[in-house]
Amino acid sequence: MELCVISTTTTVKAINPFLPSITRRVSSRLFQSDSVLQFGGRLKKPISRPLDMSCVSRKIGFFGDFMSHGGNFRLFAAASPAVETSVKEDKLPADLKVTETVQANSSVKLSVEVPEIVCEDCYQRVLTEFMKLSKVPGFRPKTRVPENIIVGFVGRQYVLRATVESILKRTLPHAMESVTGRALKDSIQIVSSFPDMEKAYSKLKTLSYEVVVDVVPELKWNPEDGYKNMKVVVELGDEIDAKKACERQLRQKYKSLGALKIVTERGLQVGDLAVVDISATTIDEDGSTGQAIPDAESKGFHFDTEEGNRLLPGFLDAIIGIRAGESKSFTLVFPESWKQESLRGQRAQFTVDCKELFYRDLPTLDDSLADKLLPGCTTLKEVEETLAKRCQEMEQEAKEQATDNAILEQIRKMVEVEIPQSLFEEQGRQFYGARLLEIQGNMKLNEDQLASLSSQKAVNEFLETQRESITNIIKQNIAVGDIFKRENLEFSTDELVKEVENSISEFKKHKQEFDEERVKDQVQEILEGAKVLEWLKDRAEIQYITR
């Protein structure tokens, strides 16, 4: 039940088990948020050189895009000849006219006009390729075939489509030269309809088309250089206090040794475990019943009363004394610090049905339980000391995590940047993929469930509901990268090589597929982030307060 959790906590992130030690530590701070997980996804890189032909066909996805518009283009795409030459080697017989229009969300529209002489040259190349590939009756292979015969043999419509494709594949790299160094890879989209281009070319023997491409977003700091002398307030919850955490862990381990017995002669008291059904509705200002609160509904919820301080304030007190089979209704107000903003300050009517009630029959806590509490220990003192050491390490890690989160959140608020749509979608899909892996790791999904969760509809819903969180993380990543460049920070090649090797060995150890270049990109970004956080913390004024 979403409501029955502590409302304000220090976030300790889940960590990708396949990343090495330094990578795990840093990536858990840099690339995760309260609502989405990211395992160090690399931001898109700008295209640093003009696209060549093979790059066009591989990266832009002509075929997939056009097939939705061009009827039987799938067959044509598979069989049509392609001229794969670099921009420098393939000099066009005339210049293209390219008009650049800046659009929202760091994108640029390129309106491309291809002269008739270029179109004719592409047409002749297509005919030549078909002559090489076709076995025309009455003509020897690879010999010159009259235009009307080869067109009739191949099919006029087929030649037309092949010519339009040839024009696109040949001219697009030249058209993209104006955004070389700024264009984000995998973001290029031809927005003109393929059938419309076919019709236009067949009538005019020239071709015009439009391309939209995302470019590296321009970052503005407000205030300028504000990140250099930040004042950061870090809120720490008492749940990360080493002493209290140690006490909680020891208590949990001790409770696990007790037997649960049914309560028969009394009502609920602190220390018991209750199985309850919970429902809640909002209360309007006029006192009337409002809408149900889905996140508060739970059937068969196992409520440990010793964890009552981690619930909605007043919830435990309201049900003390309830007996099995009884029902209680009561009103509570969500505090202003509640995690879900929409519920802050909201009055709500709760109904709790107690199904079962248990108490723990605990053994005497002495040295005889030491090994059961913590294998390898012989005394309670040894158990306490071992747990205390672990909790102190966890406290330090949680404190560092909270500090990094606070710094990243502050620099995010300092930057103004338009996020390209392709970048948002790429990062969002990475987050969703990580979320899906997490779900699969926690429960067994059947084929129908997996198909449903993997559907485009599910992904799109995730992107929409998590838009703010995804955008915030991207802003953090962009800000971190900008600081790294601005301040000329660097890390050694040895560090990079070592961490890449460690990451790859972990992937191999767990028999996970990986792309070595992508792993290198991820590790590089993580190391950059570590250097930036270290640099920022050395110059920031940091104050810690406990909630």
Curated annotation (Swiss-Prot):
E.C. numbers: 5.2.1.8
Gene Ontology biological process terms from the UniProt entry: protein folding; protein transport
Cell inner membrane in keyword set: no
Compartment(s) of residence: Plastid, Chloroplast
GO MF annotations, alphabetized: mRNA binding; peptidyl-prolyl cis-trans isomerase activity
Residue list for modification N-acetylalanine: A78
Free-text domain note: Consists of 3 domains; the N-terminus binds the ribosome, the middle domain has PPIase activity, while the C-terminus has intrinsic chaperone activity on its own.
Function per UniProt: Involved in protein export. Acts as a chaperone by maintaining the newly synthesized protein in an open conformation. Functions as a peptidyl-prolyl cis-trans isomerase.
Protein's UniProt name: Trigger factor-like protein TIG, Chloroplastic
